[in-house]
Amino acid sequence: MATGKIVQVIGAVVDAEFPQDSVPKVYDALEVMNGKEKLVLEVQQQLGGGIVRCIAMGTSDGLSRGLKVEDLGHPIEVPVGKATLGRIMNVLGTPIDMKGEIETEERWSIHREAPTYEELSNSQELLETGIKVMDLICPFAKGGKVGLFGGAGVGKTVNMMELIRNIAIEHSGYSVFAGVGERTREGNDFYHEMTDSNVLDKVSLVYGQMNEPPGNRLRVALTGLTMAEKFRDEGRDVLLFVDNIYRYTLAGTEVSALLGRMPSAVGYQPTLAEEMGVLQERITSTKTGSITSVQAVYVPADDLTDPSPATTFAHLDATVVLSRQIASLGIYPAVDPLDSTSRQLDPLVVGQEHYDVARGVQSILQRYQELKDIIAILGMDELSEEDKLVVARARKIQRFLSQPFFVAEVFTGSPGKFVSLKDTIRGFKGILNGDYDHLPEQAFYMVGTIEEAVEKAKKL
């Protein structure tokens, strides 16, 4: 193992000098004793003359020139396998939950090759989430990739927590959760939510919060992914949750600027598409096992054409778009049924009935959207009888797309609901066919199945 010394520290960027014959390779991990703490650096560039430029994985407070640096001779390696379940780890795979060491011999490098073309598998099996609007409009594929797009405060994290809870309880598989640059409070809420629903022993948690340096936030997604890859290569169907992909991009932007690269559009890093590809190409299913991933994507200023969300779109099978307009109506989950799409919404995959009901729901909502202008100017009375019926059904459908969540019970006071796909299709088909035209629209708000709406109507 080669030893060098620190020659320059600028925030999270540290330059170290090594003997000319033993310069560390790019992506090698280096270790510095900073007081009593060990700090890990990752080599990003070789500057020549034995000097390497590194990004710190922790705070560089207290570092000084001349400190001894050791080359570990390999990239950052993290523990993998069943020992990681139920534990909270940081970017280096070190436990941060005060429950002692992680007992495992096996450690994998966080930089790995994506599976080759021959190894990839293509499955058309659906993953039932129990959330009506998602199962109907943008069904998820087992081994597929889903993006939850939304601006600030429209419910990305709550939707993700509900998905994890439902899938962990109903499907009893393993999950890995990577918290990338999110709030520590959310990580804490999440941990307690998993403990309360008794699914903590099926989830590995990897956190790199907002207050961590950019190098940490850029690599923490890879740490979580590596743990998921291990479960996949053991032949399991694993779920990978990433909250938030935008912060991964943002950390890349910060690192890129610190390393002195020229920025590209909107100030993002010039390597935006490549960095996203490196992560996304590894999140895939092979003939051995599958990784189904759900990724929250923050949309800056609610602009879906921003380079960061736009780059993410290209990699996904299903996009769930959360809308501020729908949230302001008090309809949660605030999924926009006209903007959300899925590759699986195809009669050959979901069946003709599901496809027809989903498209029927979308077309009636689209017609309602068009009639809104007329209603705003002339009022409801000026509409034809046919259009009045469309509006009445559309408003019922809009309310029936809402649903009480298990993870939001604390806030709403109403118990959560898991609705099977069969019940979802039956309910919406009934509304489209006019079977429930006699019920008031309030009856459809925040209920599970259509039977609950009928019961609620009796009490109104």
From Swiss-Prot:
<keyword id="KW-0067">ATP-binding</keyword>
<comment type="similarity">
    <text>Belongs to the ATPase alpha/beta chains family.</text>
</comment>
<keyword id="KW-1003">Cell membrane</keyword>
<dbReference type="InterPro" id="IPR036121">
    <property type="entry name" value="ATPase_F1/V1/A1_a/bsu_N_sf"/>
</dbReference>
<comment type="subunit">
    <text>F-type ATPases have 2 components, CF(1) - the catalytic core - and CF(0) - the membrane proton channel. CF(1) has five subunits: alpha(3), beta(3), gamma(1), delta(1), epsilon(1). CF(0) has three main subunits: a(1), b(2) and c(9-12). The alpha and beta chains form an alternating ring which encloses part of the gamma chain. CF(1) is attached to CF(0) by a central stalk formed by the gamma and epsilon chains, while a peripheral stalk is formed by the delta and b chains.</text>
</comment>
<dbReference type="GO" id="GO:0005886">
    <property type="term" value="C:plasma membrane"/>
</dbReference>
<dbReference type="InterPro" id="IPR003593">
    <property type="entry name" value="AAA+_ATPase"/>
</dbReference>
<dbReference type="GO" id="GO:0045259">
    <property type="term" value="C:proton-transporting ATP synthase complex"/>
</dbReference>
<keyword id="KW-0066">ATP synthesis</keyword>
<keyword id="KW-0813">Transport</keyword>
<keyword id="KW-0472">Membrane</keyword>
<keyword id="KW-1278">Translocase</keyword>
<dbReference type="InterPro" id="IPR024034">
    <property type="entry name" value="ATPase_F1/V1_b/a_C"/>
</dbReference>
<dbReference type="Pfam" id="PF02874">
    <property type="entry name" value="ATP-synt_ab_N"/>
</dbReference>
<dbReference type="InterPro" id="IPR020003">
    <property type="entry name" value="ATPase_a/bsu_AS"/>
</dbReference>
<dbReference type="GO" id="GO:0005524">
    <property type="term" value="F:ATP binding"/>
</dbReference>
<keyword id="KW-0375">Hydrogen ion transport</keyword>
<dbReference type="InterPro" id="IPR055190">
    <property type="entry name" value="ATP-synt_VA_C"/>
</dbReference>
<dbReference type="Pfam" id="PF00006">
    <property type="entry name" value="ATP-synt_ab"/>
</dbReference>
<keyword id="KW-0997">Cell inner membrane</keyword>
<dbReference type="InterPro" id="IPR027417">
    <property type="entry name" value="P-loop_NTPase"/>
</dbReference>
<dbReference type="InterPro" id="IPR005722">
    <property type="entry name" value="ATP_synth_F1_bsu"/>
</dbReference>
<dbReference type="GO" id="GO:0016887">
    <property type="term" value="F:ATP hydrolysis activity"/>
</dbReference>
<dbReference type="GO" id="GO:0046933">
    <property type="term" value="F:proton-transporting ATP synthase activity, rotational mechanism"/>
</dbReference>
<feature type="binding site">
    <location>
        <begin position="150"/>
        <end position="157"/>
    </location>
    <ligand>
        <name>ATP</name>
    </ligand>
</feature>
<keyword id="KW-0547">Nucleotide-binding</keyword>
<protein>
    <recommendedName>
        <fullName>ATP synthase subunit beta</fullName>
        <ecNumber>7.1.2.2</ecNumber>
    </recommendedName>
</protein>
<dbReference type="InterPro" id="IPR004100">
    <property type="entry name" value="ATPase_F1/V1/A1_a/bsu_N"/>
</dbReference>
<dbReference type="Pfam" id="PF22919">
    <property type="entry name" value="ATP-synt_VA_C"/>
</dbReference>
<dbReference type="InterPro" id="IPR000194">
    <property type="entry name" value="ATPase_F1/V1/A1_a/bsu_nucl-bd"/>
</dbReference>
<dbReference type="InterPro" id="IPR050053">
    <property type="entry name" value="ATPase_alpha/beta_chains"/>
</dbReference>
<comment type="function">
    <text>Produces ATP from ADP in the presence of a proton gradient across the membrane. The catalytic sites are hosted primarily by the beta subunits.</text>
</comment>
<keyword id="KW-0406">Ion transport</keyword>
<keyword id="KW-0139">CF(1)</keyword>
